[in-house]
Amino acid sequence: MLIVVSPAKTLDYESPVSTSNFTQPELTAHSAELIQVCRTLSSQDVSELMSVSDKIAGLNVARFAQWSETFTLDNARQAIFAFKGDVYTGLEAETLSPQDLDFAQQHLRMLSGLYGVLRPLDLMQPYRLEMGTKLANARGANLYQFWGDIITEKLNQAIEAQGDNVLVNLASNEYFKAVNPKRLNAQIVTPIFKDAKNGQYKIISFFAKKARGMMARYIIENRIKSVKDLEGFNTAGYYFVASESTPTELVFKREEQ
């Protein structure tokens, strides 16, 4: 079972991490190409392209300038600890055991606009480049055209290496659009998380993102191997709803918080 999640805009390069083990990201030649494009952008260009404040634009212009093709624990940190958005609040990577991290290294992948695909212990230099960014490049008008089938091929390698053909899609639509399902050698299963609000169950972004991280942790901690076993997920009050689920979409609901 291979899990894919989105990255996060919020990063943490300060908090202590639980391991000094790391691996090198595998698609850095492609990342370096994107960095060269990004280095041609002014702070105002970045602000307009990414719809961010002048301050955040300036920060990322500096990050692009400082980015190096050599990744060390001095200029980078393991991706699973560097990302700190809602998904990662749910994942709580800092409390995973060494054995959990070993399992995650084989079974969890983070999609990324700059790095393509990251394993949990892959070193990552700080950046901001969301997959939906319309960054013109030598391969096309945006990052989907830049990455083409590279991300899909990398996921296929991971699927083959870990021994079955189930991919659990816990990524956002923006990121999973970078994957070509027709070329993916896997059955795709997408968990859907709905929270009660004013008497109706709906997908509430903040809760759904956190739930995706909690589901990833559930799979890692329990060494889940089958789609059937995903139905047992009950973290934070969620429960499986068989009547609304299909073989490709598993629906989980929770009462109003």
Curated annotation (Swiss-Prot):
Query: Coiled-coil stretches, from where to where?
Result: none
Q: Offer a single GO CC term for the protein.
A: cytosol
What's the domain of life for this entry? Answer: Bacteria
> A biological process (GO) annotation for this entry?
response to hydroperoxide
Kindly give the InterPro entries that the UniProt entry links to this protein.
YaaA
Family assignment from sequence similarity:
Belongs to the UPF0246 family.
Q: Which HAMAP family match?
A: UPF0246
What is the protein named? UPF0246 protein VC_2355
What is the originating organism of this protein? Vibrio cholerae serotype O1 (strain ATCC 39315 / El Tor Inaba N16961)
Species classification: Bacteria, Pseudomonadati, Pseudomonadota, Gammaproteobacteria, Vibrionales
